[in-house]
């Protein structure tokens, strides 16, 4: 686990309860490990500079909040079966339309994946830190220690 509840509440200023946090933290960490081709794991986290560790932890927290939104959409959709929200009604030939726009947007798995990747890309974009280039999202595994951009500065 890359982040604890204290970091989530105090540094990230997250709003979820500890129980809700625990529900989503491991999945968030697994998504980052997958997207970084296992460059970021429990065993490698402390090998990065503090600035990058902070970004990784922030990314986990942002994913936790997003996964909670997805879960709320699933819960809302299942509640529609019991408590349907009427969007429109027609009396002649009886036609009823239910509002599912909010939940359908968040239930779309492609949309979920796009949102998750967007968060990861924003938090873990390639950068130079202290003259070393870090590209955690590259699909090419290479050990380039120097940064051409940093050496120009």
Task: Report residues per predicted region.
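Divalent metal-cofactor coordination and adjacent catalytic microenvironments
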Residues: 1-153
């Amino acid at each position: 686990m890359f982040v604890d509840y204290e970091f989530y509440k105090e540094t990230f200023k997250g709003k979820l309860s500890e129980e809700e946090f625990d529900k989503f933290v491991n999945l968030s960490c697994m998504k980052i490990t997958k997207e970084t081709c296992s460059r970021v794991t429990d065993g490698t986290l402390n090998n990065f500079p503090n600035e990058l560790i902070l970004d990784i932890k922030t990314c986990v927290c942002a994913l936790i909040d997003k996964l909670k939104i997805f879960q709320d959409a699933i819960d809302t959709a299942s509640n529609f079966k019991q408590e349907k929200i009427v969007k429109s009604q027609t009396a002649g030939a009886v036609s009823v339309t239910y509002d599912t726009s909010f939940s359908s947007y968040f239930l779309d798995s492609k949309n979920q994946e796009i949102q998750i990747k967007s968060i990861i890309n924003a938090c873990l974009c390639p950068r130079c830190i202290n003259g070393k280039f870090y590209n955690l999202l590259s699909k090419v595994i290479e050990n380039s220690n120097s940064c051409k951009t940093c050496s120009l500065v």
